[in-house]
């Protein structure tokens, strides 16, 4: 399946716009990772623990979106956007991926 942030796919003609599809996931960052990230923030380093959690959450949201598009017979998803939202003070992050499921001629 072709998944792109653009509104068209070079070499393909969109036959039908099916509907908006999305995938969401919530990632929780645990206390031990928070402590390590806090230390890295003080010393100016990057927190690979947080980066890994965010990467995994993004991949999960994208996979969920693709699975929903496949269920409706889509050949691709165009106009994909990935958003990140902090949920409260508890270290929770929601990642959502949205796009338009399409078929190609």
From Swiss-Prot:
Record-linked Gene3D superfamilies: Hypothetical protein apc22750. Chain B
InterPro entries: UPF0145_dom_sf, UPF0145_YbjQ-like
Domain of life: Bacteria
Family to which the UniProt record says this protein belongs: Belongs to the UPF0145 family.
Protein known as: UPF0145 protein jk0060
Organism of derivation: Corynebacterium jeikeium (strain K411)
């Amino acid at each position: 399946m072709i998944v792109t942030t653009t509104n068209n796919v070079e070499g393909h003609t969109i036959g039908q716009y099916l509907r908006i599809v999305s995938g969401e996931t919530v990632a929780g960052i645990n206390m031990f990772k928070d402590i390590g990230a806090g230390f890295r923030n003080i010393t100016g380093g990057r927190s690979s623990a947080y980066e890994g959690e965010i990467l995994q959450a993004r991949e999960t949201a994208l996979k969920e979106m693709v699975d929903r598009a496949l269920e409706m017979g889509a050949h691709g998803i165009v106009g994909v956007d990935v958003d990140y939202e902090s949920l409260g003070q508890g270290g929770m992050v929601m990642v959502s991926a949205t796009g338009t499921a399409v078929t190609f001629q």
